[in-house]
Amino acid sequence: MLRNGVDIIEIDRLEKINPGIRARFINRVYTESEIEICGNNYPCLAGRFAAKEAVSKVLGTGIGEIRWKDIEILRGEEGQPIIKLHANAKLKEIELGIHHWAISISHSRTVAIAFVIAH
């Protein structure tokens, strides 16, 4: 069965996070590898945030049953985004019989969007 998920986020939502809690937020949502990829590049972080939301929609759970770090958005050999799942997200992937993922992330100056397809 083909499944899809999409999410869009305003980039300034991340930029405007209170500096006093920004590091804690980033460390709660993103893995070390994702932080290494994006650094303080807010369009990159926003794209991965949208991607995690889109993946959670494909899995039919939303964020909650699945933790943010259970969904990891890495870089493939050619720089393309790839999805790597852990813990509850991986269990849900197996339960749903998902074997293939496709993801697209894009952003403008103001928003980031991610579209995910799985089967």
Feature-to-residue mapping (PLM):
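Core catalytic alpha/beta fold that binds nucleotide/phospho-ligands
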Residues: M1-H119
